From Swiss-Prot:
Keywords recorded for this protein, A-Z: Cytoplasm, DNA damage, DNA recombination, DNA repair, DNA-binding, Endonuclease, Hydrolase, Magnesium, Metal-binding, Nuclease
Protein name: Crossover junction endodeoxyribonuclease RuvC
Naturally occurring in which organism (per UniProt): Xanthomonas euvesicatoria pv. vesicatoria (strain 85-10) (Xanthomonas campestris pv. vesicatoria)
Residue pairs linked by disulfide bridges in the UniProt entry: none
MF (Gene Ontology): crossover junction DNA endonuclease activity; DNA binding; magnesium ion binding
Keyword Nuclease: yes
Amino acid sequence: MTRILGIDPGSQRTGIGIIDIDEDGRSRHVHHAPLMLLGEGDFSQRLKRLLQGLGELIETYRPDEVAIERVFMGKSAASALKLGHARGAAICAVVMRDLPVHEYAATEVKLALVGKGGADKVQVQHMVGIMLNLKGKLQPDAADALAVAITHAHVRATAQRLGVNTQQAWSRKK
């Protein structure tokens, strides 16, 4: 059994999703939640809260591997920079605990789950719910975090079949 933590980084709210993968490659939902960062003081205090919150989550759920969404450049450079800082804090929380980090672009996650890189959030939420047999509507941040974890599980399985690392497996999937 392998436990994967998926992270959808954000400067106001970071999505967390945890799944277990059995020996046959089946995914099972373990936990999902947003890590709320607003109201934590200035931006540096939010980053501190993110670092501490992820550390506590890692200690509680003990993931084996971590998958995180890459930053994409939107309309606002300032927002992208803040998102990059949040992503950096998240990665620090992970590597400080000697866990491997695997990175995926949002388009790669959408392609892996929905079959097209331009899928919208509703389609991703729907597929995550189906794949993990979840009832009810998922929050976008949690759905994205679970989607990143599922994507990594698929890439990981492909890598094992091919006898290559996950980066090489993803390159072959495209």
